[in-house]
Amino acid sequence: MIPGHRGPWSAPLCRRLVPAGHSGMGLSPAASGEYGIRLFRVPWPSRPKQISRTASTESSDTQPTNDSASSQALVVQFLPKLPKQDRGLEQARSLRQGQKPEINLELIPSKKRTEMIPSSDSEIEGNLKNQAAESNQKPRPGDLIEIFRIGYEHWAIYVEDDCVVHLAPPSEFEAGSITSIFSNRAVVKYSRLQDVLHGCSWKINNKLDGTYLPLPVDKIIQRTKNMINKIVQYSLIEGNCEHFVNDLRYGVPRSQQVEHVLVEGAKAAGAVLSAVVDSIRPKPITA
């Protein structure tokens, strides 16, 4: 607080030494000695007007029209859309100024997730089959193809250009059905792999390569092509489709599918026979 200061913006009083007896306004009557004290007012600088950072579209009486135009020009310069990295800072400033934050939610759908979500059971089954097919490498000539049908596995041998040779029942009506395995004859057919699948999954399965040495590829293909369109005897136990393709690749007609069934059947028969024997065996008489 300045001595003699009456208010926050009133002019202060300044002292000046003048010779005694000198008349003038501000001479103190009680002054004594050679010099007296003269008080006079010095104009206090006016308070600077607070400049608003926010430009107003309305022109003020004390502000020239060109100032309003320049303010509007400044507003236009600062209105361009900010980059994404500066949006957070601008939003924080708006919150400090009491403005409502602008919320911009950008939802980016994931195309891959949408494609992975099937809408029906048929699409689920189709996706599984496609995944199983894509997981296998492309077959080479002479490879054995295992096809997983309902209740059993069908076998074919790959030749060329997505085509295979396989055993099929004489009637096309029976093709791909479980009744075809009970026929006593079959036709060697040259077909496209997709036509043989009948919507079933498949894989390359040369599982006997560790047991038998495969024949040369050119010999396998020659033997296979020589069998096309021939009618052969078919037997579920001794001459099925697996016997056929193994004979073409290794020269050994063998079916692990049948062997597994026979082994399991023997085990079941043994268990039944053991139970029968135990049931008819006389029990010791206890006192």
Curated annotation (Swiss-Prot):
A Pfam family: LRAT
GO molecular function, one term: N-acyltransferase activity
Tissue distribution of the protein: Expressed in testis.
LRAT domain mapped to chain residues: 144-257
S-S bridge residues: none
Keyword match Cytoplasm: yes
Activity versus pH, per record: Optimum pH is 9.0.
Keyword Lipid metabolism: yes
Protein name per the record: Phospholipase A and acyltransferase 5
Organism: Rattus norvegicus (Rat)
